[in-house]
């Protein structure tokens, strides 16, 4: 995630990621409402997207993702992840993302059961499990999340699906 980058040297940090073998740039976006923290806005995300040819994932930890999907798509995100907890209309979110020509993903807070998204897993390209208190960098991985990853892998296999599984938080070396 570029959340841990030095924003005064964003281009250098992204280049270092590429040279280190990264193939996805993860962009954490918070709004101070959905989570009690502000990270970066659209301008920084757009600059980061322009700075690389890596796949760009926009992780929208925001209260009204439907208001920003098109903006982050236009900024250069390839995969847009909305939080399950931020909407009661996940199929609409997926539709908005697809209409923007992008891949769609859903993110889950640590306390949210995996089964709560089972009814729409067939419609997403990725599921991101947040493995720390959502919205803040520099935290320790929640060990209990291992079981959640295993549950998601089993559910994907049971349903014969092929979505990507991502984890976010507490994974820096």
Protein language model regions, located:
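ABC family nucleotide-binding domain
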Residues: 112, 133, 152-155
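Conserved N-terminal beta1-alpha1 strand-loop-helix module at the mouth
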Residues: 1-79, 87-89, 96-104, 117-124, ...
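Short gly/ser/thr-rich secondary-structure transition/capping motifs
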Residues: 107-111
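Predominantly soluble domains enriched in secretory-pathway, periplasmic, or organellar proteins
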Residues: 94-96, 112
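Generic enzyme active-site microenvironment
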Residues: 26, 166-167
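Short glycine-rich, flexible loops that bind phosphorylated cofactors or substrates
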Residues: 89, 113, 135-136
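Acidic, divalent-metal-coordinating active-site segment for phosphoryl/phosphodiester hydrolysis
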Residues: 170-173
């Amino acid at each position: 995630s570029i959340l841990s980058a030095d924003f005064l040297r964003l281009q250098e940090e992204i280049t270092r990621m590429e040279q280190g073998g990264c193939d996805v740039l993860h962009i954490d976006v918070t709004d101070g409402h959905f989570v009690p923290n502000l990270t970066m806005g659209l301008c920084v995300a757009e600059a980061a997207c322009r700075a690389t040819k890596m796949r760009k994932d926009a992780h929208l930890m925001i209260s009204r993702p439907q208001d920003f999907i098109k903006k982050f798509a236009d900024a250069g995100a390839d995969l847009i992840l909305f939080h399950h907890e931020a909407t009661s209309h996940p199929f609409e979110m997926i539709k908005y993302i697809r209409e923007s020509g992008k891949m769609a993903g859903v993110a889950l807070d640590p306390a949210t059961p995996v089964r709560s998204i089972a009814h729409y897993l067939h419609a997403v390209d990725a599921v991101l499990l947040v493995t720390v208190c959502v919205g803040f960098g520099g935290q320790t991985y929640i060990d209990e999340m291992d079981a959640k990853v295993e549950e998601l892998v089993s559910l994907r296999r049971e349903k014969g699906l092929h979505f990507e599984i991502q984890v976010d938080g507490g994974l820096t070396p």
